[in-house]
């Protein structure tokens, strides 16, 4: 396509990108990558980019999904769209197949899975609680949505709808989503087990609202749009008073600012809420 790059620079960039893509493809196993980060130069799988302890590829990590299998699947799908190389679509679909295989029948994903060698991946560690932070539900859902957009295959749509339906059901009555989800109780909770506790940290509201918006765009089902409006209503209700009129990162079951982790005391900022409300205004024209 048209570009403002010189021919030489375009060729060099293409060469650099394809080298990286081909290199990372070598580390895909049965559709998945072992980690969201690898220790250079030995390429030993590590937990995250800021907790680089090695785990020797014993599991597949879904939290911090932008850097793991769901995010890499989207990267290869983008590479296919830009470069037109069928290999990259194949790699993205293999990642998608792994994501679908790991999905719980109720539509959610857990933090980690044992290496997938055959049949369904098995959950590693706690299988009584999952979460909404750091793209744990959002990134695999968006991979499925973009694969459906690119291929039109129903299997991607079906898995994406399962995820979307889970998020609608897991939304708190007040419109928020919490940090965690109790699988046994089928309810959202914060770090301390309190229900109906909204949370902006680590992209929780942004991520789930994005999935709802995409689900509405793909299916046209009103319940996804209604979920978005409920989320915006909660954001407006959670706004704190003068003089700053900001928002906390974490809320308790009474919709009051609360602690998160030990270094996350009750506090206030504009980050994480204001842009969501402006986006909802752009979409709805509702000035409230």
Predicted regions and their residues:
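Glycan-recognition and catalytic cores of secretory/periplasmic carbohydrate-active enzymes
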Residues: 1-288
């Amino acid at each position: 396509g048209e570009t403002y790059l010189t021919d030489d620079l375009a060729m060099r960039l293409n060469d650099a990108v394809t080298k990286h893509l081909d290199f990372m493809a070598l580390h895909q196993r049965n559709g998945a990558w072992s980690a969201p980060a690898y220790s250079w130069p030995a390429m030993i799988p590590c937990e995250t980019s800021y907790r680089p302890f090695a785990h020797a590829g014993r599991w597949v990590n879904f939290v911090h999904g932008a850097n793991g299998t769901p995010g890499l699947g989207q990267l290869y799908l983008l590479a296919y769209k830009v470069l037109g190389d069928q290999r990259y679509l194949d790699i993205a679909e293999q990642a998608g197949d792994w994501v679908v295989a790991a999905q719980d029948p109720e539509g959610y994903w857990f933090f980690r899975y044992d290496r997938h060698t055959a049949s369904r991946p098995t959950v590693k560690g706690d299988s009584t609680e999952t979460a909404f932070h750091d793209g744990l539900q959002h990134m695999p859902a968006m991979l499925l949505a973009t694969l459906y957009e690119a291929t039109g295959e129903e299997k991607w749509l079906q898995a994406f709808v399962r995820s979307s339906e889970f998020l609608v059901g897991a939304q708190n009555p007040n419109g928020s989503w919490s940090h965690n989800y109790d699988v046994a109780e089928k309810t959202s909770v914060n770090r301390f087990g309190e229900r109906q506790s909204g949370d902006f940290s680590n992209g929780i509201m942004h991520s789930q609202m994005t999935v709802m918006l995409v689900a509405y765009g793909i299916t046209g089902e009103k319940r996804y749009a209604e979920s978005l409006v409920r989320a915006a209503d909660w954001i407006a209700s959670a706004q704190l008073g003068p003089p700053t009129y900001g928002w906390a990162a974490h809320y308790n079951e009474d919709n009051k600012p609360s602690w998160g982790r030990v270094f996350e005391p009750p506090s206030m900022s504009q980050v994480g809420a204001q842009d969501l409300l402006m986006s909802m205004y752009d979409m709805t024209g509702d000035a409230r």
